[in-house]
Structures are given as C-alpha cells and as structure tokens.
Amino acid sequence: TTALISLGSLLLLVCDGGRALPEPQACGVVPEAWRFDCYPERGVVVTRELCEARNCCFIPASSSPPALGRNGVPWCFYPPGFPSYSLVSVNATDLGQTGTLVKTVKTYYPKDILTLQLGLLYETDNRLRVRITDPSESRFEVPIAVPKATEKASSPAYSVELSNEPFGIIVKRTSTGAVLLNTTVAPLFYCDQFLQLSSSLSSQYIYGLGEHRSSFLHDIHWNTLTMWARDVATSSLLPDHDSILYPLTNLYGVHPFYLAMDEGGTGTAHGFFLLNSNAMDVVLQPGPAITWRTIGGILDFYVFLGPDPTSVIGQYLEVVGYPAMPVYWALGYHLCRWGYGSSNATWDVVKNMRNYGIPQDVQWNDIDYMDRSLDFTFDPTAFSTLPDMVKDLHSHGQRYVMMLDPGISSVQPEGGYWPYDEGLRRGVFINHTDGSTLIGKVWPGLTAFPDFSDDVTHEWWYDNLKRFHDKVPFDGLWIDMNEPSSFVDGSTVGCPDTELENPPYTPGETHTHLSHLTSSHYNMHSLYGLLEAKASCPEAYVRKRAFVISRSTFPSQGQYSGHWLGDNRSHWKDMYTSIAGMLTFNLLGVPLVGADICGFSEQTEEELCVRWTQLGAFYPFTRNHNSIDQKPQDPPAFSPAARSAMKQSLLLRSSLFPLLYTLFHRAHTHGHTVARPLLFEFPKDVRTYGIDRQFLWGKSLMVTPVLDPGVDYVVGYFPQGLWYDYYTGDSIRSKGEELRLKAPLEHINLHLREGAVIPTQRPNTTLFVSSGQPLHLVSSLSEDGSAGGELFWDDGESIDTFETDQYAHVVFTVVKVPGSTNTITFTSSLPIASYITVETASFYGVKMEPTRVMVNSHDAAFTYRANQVRLGVRSQRLSVF
C-alpha cells in the first residue's frame, strides 16, 4: 500500500525575526521519501538560513551523499500546510467541470498568478484532460493538433475527487480504487516563469520521459530528468566506470509522457502526458512521487486509463497522432559514414556490398558531400559523380538519403547562394527583437535559422528541396542539428540581460544559461525538430511516402519522421542502452527508431560489430554509421567470418520483412508498438517490468541478443508458456524463468511464442527484389493446436493506401479439426491482391507425424522431424485467397 502524505494538515508556526517558520514537530512527520524539494535551484549550497527564508523545513538527510546524476534526499522541503491554492468554486459543464483557484499568500518566486482557471474534461471513458490556465492573460500553448471532445464520457473508467484546501486533484481507477494521481502531496506553483505540479505515482514502475540515456525502467530514487532539446553527443555522457549507469542529462528530444504500471502486479497501467514545450525538470522520488517544474506555458495534462500497457499507448497516440506508415525500403539496411570523402568512395562501398551479396537498401552521405557545408549543394570536385551514383542506386532498386542542417550560411556573396538570398527576401529567418536576422554559427560558419513555425518558411524550404532534387534525385532526408544547435551562445552578439534570459529557476540541462547552443525562443525551442520534419516531408516532389529521420523530436513526431538515437560510442554498454532507447521511442509514438550500428565514435571491434549488426537487424530502423577519421565498419571491411555473420543477420531481417511491415501497419492504424517490451505482453509478470536486454517484435517474436564480449551464450528470461526456437522449432516450456542459451558468434537467439503465425519470404539483397517473393508461413502451435497471425500488403510506397483501400489484409488461422488429432485446417481472408502466394509453411508443435497432408484438397509433400516437432509443407504455390 502506498502511503500518501498530504500537505493539507495543520501547520504549526513559530516566529523567528518576523518570519513564520514551521514547527519542528510538523517537519519531523514528513518521511524522507515524501520530502518535496523547496530549494531546487542548482549550484546553491542550501543552508538553514536560505531554507527558512522560504518558510520551509530544514533537516539534513540521514542517507549518504547521492550518486552521480542524482539529487539525493532534499534537506530543504515543504512542511505540511505550506501555502498553496484554494478551490473556491466548482461548476458543471457539458464536458466535465470548471473551477476557480485562488492563492492569497505569494510565493518566493516572482510574478505569482494568484487566480487560476481549472478545467476538467471527461473526454472519453479512458481519457481525462486537465487544464489549469490564467483567466486574465493568454499564455503560450503548444501548437499541435489534439482531439476536441464534443460530449462528456458516459462511463469513465476513472473518478475525480477535488480537494478544496489546499487545492488538489485525485484520480482513481474505478475498477480497483487505485490512486493514479494525487496532487495534494505538495503545493502547486503557478508563476510567470515557474510552474510546479507534484503527484503521487501508483508504483515504482515508470517508463517514457524521453530523451535521456537510462535503463528502460526509470529509477525513482531521486532522479531528475531535464527536458530541453539539446545538441550533446551521448558519447560524452557515458562514464566508463561500470558501477555508474549514465547521468540523466537531457538530449535531443522532449517527450513529457510516462507510462506507469499499477501496484501489485495486477497488469493494469495508466499514462500521463503534460502538453508543454518549455524547459522543464521532472523529478522522480521514492515516495513514489513525481514533480514537474517548467518555466513557461500552461499546465495542460492528460491521464490515460488503459487498462493495459498497449491500450495506454494507443490512447496517448489518439491525442498526439499515430505514426506514419513508412515506405517499404525504409525497413531495409542503411549504410552511412561521416568521411567517405568522395562520391566515388561512397560508390565503392555500395559495389563491395553487392559483390559480397550483402543486403543494402539505402546509401547515405553525411555533411562531407556538401560544398563548404552549405545546404542544398554538393562538392563539385570530390562529389562530382554524385548524380551518377544516385542513378546507379536507383537502377539496382536502392535508394539515397542525404543530410541537411537547418543553419543557412549568411556570409556568401550576395546573389551567390539562393537559399539565403531568397530566405531573406521572403523573411523566413528567426529575428532579434529589433527585427534584424539572428545570426548563429554552425558548420558553414555564420548562419541564419529558418522559422519553421511559419508556413512561408515551409514553402521556401520546399522550393529549396525541389531545386536540389532536380539535380540529385534523393529519396529521403536526414535532418540533423535541429534542436536547433548553434556553436555560440544565443547568437553572435550574445544574449540580452533580461528576465526572459534569466528565469528565477533554470532546469538542469548542464549549461549555465539556457541560451547555450540555442536561440532564446523558450516556447518554441523544443518544437523546432518537429516543425522542421513537417516541412521536410518530400511527398510532393518524390510523389511517394516520405522518409525523414530527425535528431530532435517532440510528441506527434512519428507522424512526420523517424529518429536515430544520436552519437553513441563503439562500446558494449552503448549497444545495451540502445535497446532501452528503442523501446522508449516505441512508447512515445516514434517506432521507426534505431541506433548507429557498431557505434558512431571511437574505433569499433570486429566482435562488437558482429553482435551489434545482429541486434541492429531487429531495430525497426537499421543503419550502420560512424564518424570521420574512424576505420571503416561496413560489413565488407571485416574478416570473412565476421562478414558472413553480418550477411546472415541482414538476410534474416530481409526474410522477416512481411512481419515487420505488418507491425508498422498496426502502429499506423492502432498506435501499437513495433519493437515491444516484454511487459506489454506479460503485464502480470512483474519480472518482465525491468527487462531491457530482450524485446519482442509484435506479440510473438522474442529477440535475445548477446550484449557482452567474449561469450558464446546468453541468458534470457522466458515468461510462462510454450516457446519455440525460431530456427529449429525446438520447444521450451517455461514456468517463468531465466534460461541459458547457446549463442556462437554467428547466431542471435529468436523464439516464437505459442499461438502465432508469422509471414516470411525468401530474402534478397534489396527489399525491392525480396518483397515480390512468395510467402513462407511459420506457425507456432498452442497446446490446443491453434495459432493465428496476419499480413498487411500494398505496393509499399504509394501514399494513403490504407485510407483509400488499396491494400490486402490477410488473416491466417490454424485450428485443429474436432475429432482428429492430425488434421490442421489453414484458412485466410483477403479482399484483393491475388499476387500474394504462399509457397511453403512450417508448423511448430505438431506432436505426431501426420500420415497425410493436403492443400486445397490435393496431397502435398511434407517432411517431419520429431526431435524438432516441425512440419514442412511444400506444394504448388497457393494463392492466399
């Protein structure tokens, strides 16, 4: 049972020099786990005098000093009864309730807003929205489209209780009475540049809150997660000492959403989303409790009731938008590096991949393809053959992706650089308050930054893309440095000494001023990557589905782009943490995600690169990328044995493309995850809650990679049930236990959960070729002989095929016919698409050798191996309808 400490109890006061101080006995009743920090400013040694000047309790913590990246138990904390808002009126509305909040005692932060408007919106049976706003003055609200409820939920899965004095909101799950949100645990702050909301958590099991380097399951023991989009190489954040994980510093994206499992292993889950784009700190403490501190905007948040984890994510994505359906080749193998040096050197790598028969769908170039790092150019000398290379890629069914940065050079001769000249003419750049163009510094030198919140900028950006596409017919875009990043503080003239630049509280993003590496647009800063992605979708000029990979992300990003996890290192630890990043972004609605395979910085090692390629074959987005001046790490650069192991991993991925494509369809239409944590499928198994060394594709295919050097085995957890080795069909009946699995260097362990049918196909070196191959179906039978699965299929690149019914949806069902132990009926349903055929099928879990196998009433050849309980059917190609 979670103990909640309400600050609504009586406050005993004593006088000390004219200040009202809390009575020591009142301070002593607050357990350490429920101390909410009254002096959160960084870089300050908090003394008793400073603390008591805020009328707060000061008690040194009993525990030892905190570890790196943690705050530790606060010594200065709010006493019971600390002044907060009061709820003075409540009225019913068509959608819920509205109320007025009043504060009579000002806080220690400037510009308190003393009267607030409360809005409770019962939007659906599983979604509650709460808005706390300033009724007298408009404040910034995040400009992303969210659904507008038109009627109040009729049978909500939640109840809402309001505390009048102090004001607080308590949200409970009606089916169990579990408390999901209780904001009475600490005072509410609502100042012009400081908003703070605290709440209890339903358990210690909390996920999401990107983007940071951490384990998938967050540690709630005094961790602070800062959210403010920032250009920082993750490789610079990773200490080598094994006893330390990672400082939870803020990275490229901002995602103020969490999923929490309810207490007690009930399997129920809920979600919370704060729709705010300003810089913020999110503090986790062992109460369990959470505090949100932000320096602008409003408090606009949602509670999602689930009740299971998959439903929570679907409900969250109903608000911010389902991810786009990717173009088919986006799911192939991508190859890149910074420092190819020339188009011919790039081309040679592609040719080597072909010579060795290693799958490759997409070739990329980093910034070195540009002429003097200028966007929308290519080096006329070193990359003179770039158009020819792209033409060659297209002739082989391959694609080309290039990098773009948002910074536009501002120092080229007038009339000599159309992007800047035309941008200046149209007024698309971010300005100083005096109307002059804000100038920063990025790779090409002094630069101006497009204002992607303006539709005029979108038109200018499109014109630039179209002009360049006419010269180099690229197929997708890699948008980088879009936090946005600048190499100078704010601009070349620095930052003004104003209240805006010096807020009373600065979230901890490790720099002295928030203007570092950014311009000073607090409200819009963390939205920049999202807005650029919206402007960058090349559908209009390639007339196919867009492919965009963005470094900076924000809620709703999945509608417009995928994401790679940033500049990692060629270290085993980095490979491990990539799984947590991949799973987290699947929760956040950006399923097209992956890390730089083999590592971006530092020299990779052959064993590491083999193991990472095996893992990377199961990233939803799989790309090998490394830095300038590092040795090559494309597969042909390694020994024959390593090269062969990498090739087999990539062929394996290619063979599983029908499954992966179908999973992305489910993500696009239902908000499902593609790469999925085990807890989503086994929410009542508490042992799955912390697993981030294994994961699932969809419901049924479990991946157990090797993440440590020098081993030929791996330990994996198998939830209760029947599992089959994907390669052999050998069965494992687990009670919910860890098992040691053989894992020689050329092998990655895959297991199928009982009751699945997954579609596969014969692999090839490009998805353009392999996607036309007949299907091979793999069925893993349950104890009762049943299994099921599906296939979504279309042309792979046309826009809105699902919305316009230009697709096939096949449902596979395996059942045991009553009265027979050896007969299996295989059925499917399909509205169109006679071009889909099934060539072979395998059934794992057939306990007795059949005497006869028939397909469409005709005898079919088969093989049976009792030690593998596998049935293979080979016949004439079978049309699935």
What annotation goes with each model-predicted range?
Residues 244-245, 747, 752-858, 872-877:
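Accessory, solvent-exposed terminal regions and/or long lumenal/extracellular loops of proteins
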Residues 1-11:
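Classical eukaryotic N-terminal signal peptides for Sec-dependent ER targeting/secretion
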Residues 145-147, 726-745, 852-875:
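Solvent-exposed beta-strand/loop surfaces of large extracellular or lumenal domains
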